[in-house]
From Swiss-Prot:
A GO-annotated cellular component: chloroplast
Molecular functions (GO terms): 3'-tRNA processing endoribonuclease activity
Main localisation: plastid
Keyword flag DNA damage: no
Gene: ycf56
UniProt xrefs under SUPFAM superfamilies: Metallo-hydrolase/oxidoreductase (SSF56281)
Subcellular localization: Plastid, Chloroplast
Membership in a protein family: Belongs to the AtsA family.
Name assigned to this protein: Uncharacterized protein ycf56
Keywords: Chloroplast, Plastid
Organism: Pyropia yezoensis (Susabi-nori)
Length: 263
């Protein structure tokens, strides 16, 4: 999986911060999972050379305009491009009513079905390779963060070596792949580790869409295989702009301190 970070940008003239937006491109397929849909998202996709037609799932962390500004426009663009495949949106419950109101007053109809899923604590998407977990970032569960878990990959069984040792095909192949050991009648010792490659461990990818420091943010970063890079601003700069939506150097050091303490 490749994570594309649509980076934070501070607009000094308007004294405003654009929230972080992510796109996850799956390795096995050409699918793209979009996390949040900020304003001007179509232009961002064009600059990043990603194809918006490959979007199959959209995860919205909150109903604020900062998270959903580009969603109606993106869906309309997909309609104009002739999309027919369904798209799944994982969001708070009120987002469905918002989109229904947008289509009503703009007199727009989408050419593809939209499947809405209400966000709640726990696994939202579970497939053969990945699991997306949703975590509430506020007490009233109005804002959510996401964790992507890549499942471990079992080692490949070395069939050629088994045939070289004249091991008959059967249930013993499965046991050897599970790295069980056997002692043959002629005294030959079979080690399961010699018949399969090592298991590739899974990965944890944290997508802290709300970058304000909190305990849950530290837990999201705990044991992350690939922590997502976030812009770190000086504490004075963060206070000047918007302190509850920017990651300052003090907050970042606090997160690392929490993780080192738990480990």
């Amino acid at each position: 999986m490749k994570i594309i970070l649509f980076d934070n940008k501070i607009n000094s003239r308007l004294n405003k911060i654009t929230l972080t937006n992510y796109a996850a491109k799956l390795d096995q397929t050409s699918e793209i999972w979009l996390f949040n849909c900020i304003e001007n998202i179509q232009h961002i996709f064009f600059k990043s050379q990603l194809k918006s037609s490959h979007i199959t799932k959209i995860f919205i962390s909150g109903t604020s305009f900062e998270y959903t500004a580009g969603l109606p426009g993106l869906l309309s663009s997909l309609t104009l491009s002739g999309r027919l495949h369904p798209i799944s949106i994982y969001s708070p419950q009120s987002l469905k009513k918002y989109l229904e109101a947008c289509t009503k007053y703009s007199q727009t109809n989408f050419s593809f079905p939209i499947n809405f899923h209400n966000l709640q604590y726990g696994g939202q998407v579970v497939n053969q390779f990945y699991t997306v977990i949703c975590l509430p970032l506020s007490k009233k569960s109005l804002l959510y963060g996401f964790i992507i878990l890549k499942k471990e990959k079992q080692g490949v069984f070395n069939l050629a070596q088994a045939k070289t040792l004249n091991i008959l095909q059967g249930p013993i192949y499965g046991k050897l792949k599970e790295k069980d050991n056997f002692l043959s009648p002629d005294g030959y010792y079979l080690s399961g580790q010699d018949f399969s490659s090592n298991t590739i461990m899974g990965h944890k990818i944290s997508l802290p869409l709300l970058v304000r420091y909190s305990r849950i943010i530290s837990e999201m970063h705990w044991f992350c295989s690939y922590p997502i890079r976030l812009n770190t601003y000086s504490h004075q700069q963060g206070v000047k702009c918007l302190p509850h939506n920017v990651l300052t150097d003090i907050m970042k050091s606090q997160i690392y301190q929490d993780n080192s303490f738990v480990e």
